[in-house]
Amino acid sequence: MTLDDSSLQKFGFIKRETLGSINIDPLQTGGLLTGAAKQALVEWGDGYSVCDFCGGVLDLVKKPPIHDFVHKALPEFLGCDEARVTNGARESKFAVMHSMGKPGDWVVLDGLAHYSSYVAAERAGLNIEVVPHAGSPEYHLDPGRYGKAIEEVTKENGKPPVLALVTYPDGSYGNIPDAAKIASVCHEYDVPLLLNGAYSVGRMPVSAKEIGADFIVGSGHKSMAASGPVGVLGVSEEYAPVVFRKSVHNKVKEIELLGCTARGATVMTLMASFPEVVKRTRNWDQEVENARWFSSRLEGMGFIQRGQKPHSHDLMFFEAPGFYEISQKVKNGRYFLYRELKERNIHGIKSGLTKYFKLSTFGLGKEKLGTVADAFEDILKKYENI
């Protein structure tokens, strides 16, 4: 590529095509910036902006009040003893796995774990034992199967896994497993538990201590109304010295965090949205009620919701036989649904999906959810005679 003025134009300001749409994308509904975060994005957007008064450790910066956010607010919010800001939930998971295990050790993952949990384990050199789910239609995760998985690893390798992980909820079906029971089972074998709360921390009330988890991770850009990439990590007092150990070469730098993590706009938007994020978790019962109402509307049209029922999260997976049938009959049928929703200013179902898709109802409220449900119904009626 020749870097002349003409070719460089494509990399200037780019207008976002979907901005202003009703957004039902599970990746995005919990990450929409608050008004305060949008202001912070402009105010603190310059590179290392938060380092105007830095003594060498990001989480100890007092101006802006990152220290109080990380060491006072986050532990209370996450229900943990020590907390840090990271560059994302996956980076949080890797920090725990890399510090807790050595290459060749084993980790136990649930059968609905996110791909990044697998990749984090691989990067840390860990082997993986999977706790299977029960399959369709609910994909239930039996806490007792964690015990069996731990026993299997111990039998084959002579020692238990260094860590177990549960996804709370999973990113496919939005199932919320019995994490407290899973923690209890793991602790019977002296195996610590990591709670992957990428879709819960910032959306719903969740406390590592109440659940019994030794580690908790969250995603700022997925569920805490922050500009990404940014995440959070909470650790119990027992394991904090392991995960947050310091370098022998630079004595203030924590090894697993590579010294400092989210600098500038990411941490500042996370902080700016935090007051509103705390408040919105108190409205979780209403979010669940809205999700169930929406699911009921769709099932009345012939859609089939997979996963836990009654559902307890905004992320839901649907089978859509009506849409799929239409896609088999119309021109360029794979993309008809995307086109129809785009015309109605609705974004979030991936282009090409008609038979199965997931969506999120988080933060939309009954009025917008009604608009989406009405749109689905209108589309079905539009093609009912083809």
Swiss-Prot record:
It comes from the Archaea. Converts O-phospho-L-seryl-tRNA(Cys) (Sep-tRNA(Cys)) to L-cysteinyl-tRNA(Cys) (Cys-tRNA(Cys)). It catalyses: O-phospho-L-seryl-tRNA(Cys) + hydrogen sulfide + H(+) = L-cysteinyl-tRNA(Cys) + phosphate. Transmembrane segments: none annotated. Homodimer. Interacts with SepRS. Belongs to the SepCysS family. Its EC number is 2.5.1.73. Keywords: Protein biosynthesis, Pyridoxal phosphate, Transferase. GO terms for biological process: translation. This is O-phospho-L-seryl-tRNA:Cys-tRNA synthase. Its cofactor is pyridoxal 5'-phosphate. Pfam families: SepSecS. GO terms for molecular function: Sep-tRNA:Cys-tRNA synthase activity. NCBIfam families: PRK09331.1, SepCysS. Pyridoxal 5'-phosphate binds at residues 89-90, 196, 219-221. The keyword Transferase applies. Gene3D superfamilies: Aspartate Aminotransferase, domain 1, Type I PLP-dependent aspartate aminotransferase-like (Major domain). The modification N6-(pyridoxal phosphate)lysine is found at residue 222.
